């Protein structure tokens, strides 16, 4: 069975549902959880070019929001008695999820079916589609 479950969060309600499922599964089977938030490099570049924002300021704000999201997962894990490691990374979200899963030797990836932002609401989770295509381990998509 699974020993290391990677749960990817973007802070959306779908991610919260995926997190709940990952924690419950981990508790039931005695697995540990890796909580990952990816700062989308395209979001950073867009904020800098379109809004004239300072790159370091944008990155710091997104880092803080990402850390808050994974810290929430850590708290859920603590309450359930599930060990949780937290990570915030910057890059292309789908590729980063797959890369972190490989680097951390995750044997299951858990994700929400789509994010809450812009075009990802219109597409059935473009990040999820890419992860499903590229991942070398099972992927649980929570609706």
Predicted stretch roles:
Residues 34, 85, 140:
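Conserved beta-strand positions in the Rossmann-like core of class I SAM-dependent methyltransferases
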Residues 53-68:
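A short acidic, glycine-rich active-site loop
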Residues 74-109:
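Structural beta-alpha unit
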Residues 50-54, 103-105, 127-128:
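Short, hinge-like loop/turn segments at secondary-structure boundaries
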Residues 3-52, 78-80:
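Small/aliphatic-rich secondary-structure junction motif
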Residues 108-130:
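Glycine-rich, Arg-bearing micro-motifs that act as flexible, cationic patches
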Residues 31-32, 82, 106, 137:
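Short glycine/serine/threonine/alanine-rich loop segments
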């Amino acid at each position: 069975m699974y020993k290391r479950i990677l749960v990817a969060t973007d802070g959306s309600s779908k991610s919260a549902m995926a997190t709940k499922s990952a924690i419950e599964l981990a508790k039931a089977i005695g697995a540990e959880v890796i909580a990952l938030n990816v700062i989308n490099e395209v979001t950073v570049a867009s904020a800098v070019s379109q809004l004239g924002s300072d790159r370091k300021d944008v990155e710091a704000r997104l880092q803080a929001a990402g850390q808050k999201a994974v810290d929430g997962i850590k708290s859920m894990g603590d309450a359930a008695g599930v060990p949780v490691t937290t990570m915030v990374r910057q890059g292309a979200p789908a590729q980063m999820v797959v890369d972190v899963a490989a680097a951390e030797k995750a044997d299951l990836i858990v994700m929400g079916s789509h994010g809450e932002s812009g075009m990802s609401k219109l597409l059935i989770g473009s990040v999820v589609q890419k992860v499903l295509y590229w991942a070398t381990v099972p992927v649980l998509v929570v609706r």
